[in-house]
Amino acid sequence: MFLSLVVYLSKICRYLSMFSSDRLTVPEYVSSRLHNRRTAPDPRAVSPGISTDVQAVLDGSLPALRSAIRTLRSSKDTGDLEETRRAIAETFQLVEEAWVLPTVGRRVAEEICNRIRLDGGLELLLQLMQTPAVEITYESAKLLEQILVSENRDYVARMGLGVILNLTREQEDAQLARSVSGILEHMFKHTEETSAQLITNGALDTILYWCRGTDPTVLRHCAVALSNCAMYGGHRCQRLMIEKQAAEWLFPLAFSKEDELIRFHACLAVAVLAANREMEKEVVKSGTLELVEPFIASLDPDEFARNMLDSADSMQGRTAADLQHLLPLLDGTRLEGKCIAAFYLCVETSIKSRQRNTKIFQEIGAVQSLKRIVMYSSNATVCSLAKRALKMMSEEVPRRILSSVPNWKSGEVQTWLQQIGFSAFSERFQELQVDGDLLLNITEQDLIQDLGMTSGLTRKRFLRDLRVLKTYANYSTCDPNNLADWLADADPRFRQYTYGLVQSGVDRNNIVHITDQQLLTDCHVENGIHRAKILSAARRPSKPCLTDSQPKGPDVFISYRRTTGSQLASLLKVHLQLRGFSVFIDVEKLEAGRFEEKLITSVQRARNFILVLSANALDKCMGDVAMKDWVHKEIVTALNGKKNIVPVTDNFVWPDPTSLPEDMSTILKFNGIKWSHEYQEATIEKILRFLEGCPSQEKPDGAKTDKKEPQKK
């Protein structure tokens, strides 16, 4: 009893510290009213399911909350706009303070958000969002964004979806966009049906329209909304996203250099879309997917977690239900999905360890998936992230398994058995000298009769792990024609059949003549559907060989300065790509190689050359006699190749011609197009005329006029 009293008093002390000078800054009239209302309440019994420390905070907050909602109701009835704004501000302050509380923040905030609904506050907010007074609409939407916990999302989906959809039509209202994009971010987590309803009524169109903008708050909400739609919306919503070119519009977000959280959620969204085999090729074609791995490899999970802890939206981390949606990426076949899911789990482990809640990862099954990656994956980035996550979870990190399974001796088989949890059978496997060859040919009958694996479920577990091993194994020593990759191209799961086919004498040349019966009896492909798909793939016409003729070059090469021109360059890429142009834009990649040669070759092979002239874009070219600057090299290559050069300016001041090296000074004679963020479609139409019509350098007089504009400003 004494111990309980001590614990309770310590929680009260922690609660009182909330009201120190470190509290969030709010309008003075709100602070004074809150101070008057927050008198210490009498001790009350703890509500069922709520811990004492959570109840202690609620006892101080709920009276003020009830008072604010009463004020909100009365001021709405009387039409007192100033009093309405005060009540909304008080409620917002209580909610925001709850979300940033350490340890108990999520539980306190959820109780407060639910209480707002139960006391009628949510209904009032939906009504206020329809009033003619725009300031009330703005502030009501801002508060609604903060209180959309699970039960409140249910209410809005049933009673207020029309209100939200009406607000999404106000695409040009920048202040409203900040809140409505946040509301959509939450609502795309609700159900597949709600997401589909939002998409079919224009909400996704609005999100994609806002992806063109520059407001970091709106862009962050858009990135998270798209990742939520992809993760929680199911196959139907993923198909709708592809039809509306969401994969393409994710490119500017993933390419952004301004905000890592924007890039991260954009990469997560495109990785989830690519995990759907039905639309994988369309996602790959967008070009966004190749941004994922280099970006993730450049991040530090601990630093990223600290940034999330600084954000009120993310500081509590994700729930178990949210994290479970990462498992299909971890267990999938796309490297990008594994990479971003492993990184996300590292970040969440860092947050959950502060909350002393790392057991959540064992409960959702993430630990086994991470161990499988460590054992089998050959990608250094994914492997290191999986190891790091396991260490932070205080889990055992398994050893990397040698990939040349056909060449395994019995010792390697023993190691593998121990790491997958079948050490009880190690002795029997050792007695029978089971090596890699025998392991790859093992059948369920062998497990029962020779290896003593009598339990049916145990055999299923073993065969499941064996399928994973067969899928990851390297067959190069026995598969000279690379049948393994051909099977994986038909379906990544079919790689497990490689050894059986190769041992039976099948290769890429004669597979077209194989029958269903031969696949079953000789190659041991027992799944009839798999046999049908393999035979169908074998009878498809082979792809034309391009070794003799070089593939066609891109329609457009986009040259830009990374520090200031990334966003405009990425927008141009998407606009042109959606209009049927093939576009090359330099993307930072991990693989080594002759980078300079590849880049110059791309300029030479392109028909058009768009030069993005953002702020200070040519500064590094000045005095660059040795041509070490990349933009300088690209411009000179385009000039020498007589490309159709189209400069696009954005906050750019044309330099003195004498300040540029002589080999690129003629670039100043080209007619440039001034970019307009507000009228992007009109600007793109002008660029299209330049690309499809005569070269821009034929109009030097127009160029001189255009170049004077920024200086006049």
Curated annotation (Swiss-Prot):
Describe the disruption phenotype: Absence of sarm1 provides a level of protection against axon degeneration. Schwann cells are protected from chemotoxicity by delaying axon degeneration. Absence of Sarm1 does not promote axon resealing.
The cellular component terms of Gene Ontology attached to this UniProt record, alphabetical and capped at eight, are:
axon; dendrite; mitochondrion; synapse
Q: Where is the active site?
A: 634
Tell me where in this chain the TIR domain is found. Answer: 552-695
The cross-references to InterPro entries, in alphabetical order and at most eight, read: ARM-like, ARM-type_fold, SAM, SAM/pointed_sf, SARM1, TIR_dom, Toll_tir_struct_dom_sf
The record lists NAD(+) 2 as bound by 561-562, 591
Database matches in Pfam families: SAM_1, SAM_2, TIR_2
Q: Which UniProt key words apply to this protein?
A: Cell projection, Cytoplasm, Differentiation, Hydrolase, Immunity, Innate immunity, Mitochondrion, NAD, Neurogenesis, Phosphoprotein, Repeat, Synapse, Transit peptide
**Biological process, per Gene Ontology:** cell differentiation; innate immune response; NAD catabolic process; negative regulation of MyD88-independent toll-like receptor signaling pathway; nervous system development; regulation of axon regeneration; response to axon injury; signal transduction
Q: How is its activity regulated?
A: Autoinhibited: in the inactive state, the enzymatic TIR domain is held apart by the autoinhibiting ARM repeats. NAD(+)-binding to ARM repeats maintains an inactive state by promoting interaction between ARM repeats and the TIR domain, thereby facilitating inhibition of the enzymatic TIR domain. Following activation, possibly by nicotinamide mononucleotide (NMN), auto-inhibitory interactions are released, allowing self-association of the TIR domains and subsequent activation of the NAD(+) hydrolase (NADase) activity. Self-association of TIR domains is facilitated by the octamer of SAM domains.
Q: Which reaction does it catalyse?
A: NAD(+) + H2O = ADP-D-ribose + nicotinamide + H(+); NAD(+) = cyclic ADP-beta-D-ribose + nicotinamide + H(+); NADP(+) + H2O = ADP-D-ribose 2'-phosphate + nicotinamide + H(+)
Q: Which residues bind NAD(+) 1?
A: 99, 106, 145-153, 186-189
**Where does it reside?**
Cytoplasm; Cell projection, Axon; Cell projection, Dendrite; Synapse
Q: In the Enzyme Commission scheme, what number(s) does this protein have?
A: 3.2.2.6, 3.2.2.-
| Molecular function GO labels | NAD+ nucleosidase activity; NAD+ nucleosidase activity, cyclic ADP-ribose generating; NADP+ nucleosidase activity; signaling adaptor activity
Q: CDD domains from the entry?
A: SAM_SARM1-like_repeat1, SAM_SARM1-like_repeat2, SARM1_N
The family this protein is said to belong to: Belongs to the SARM1 family.
Subunit-structure text: Homooctamer; forms an octameric ring via SAM domains.
Supply the name of the protein: NAD(+) hydrolase SARM1
Q: Which organism is it from?
A: Danio rerio (Zebrafish)
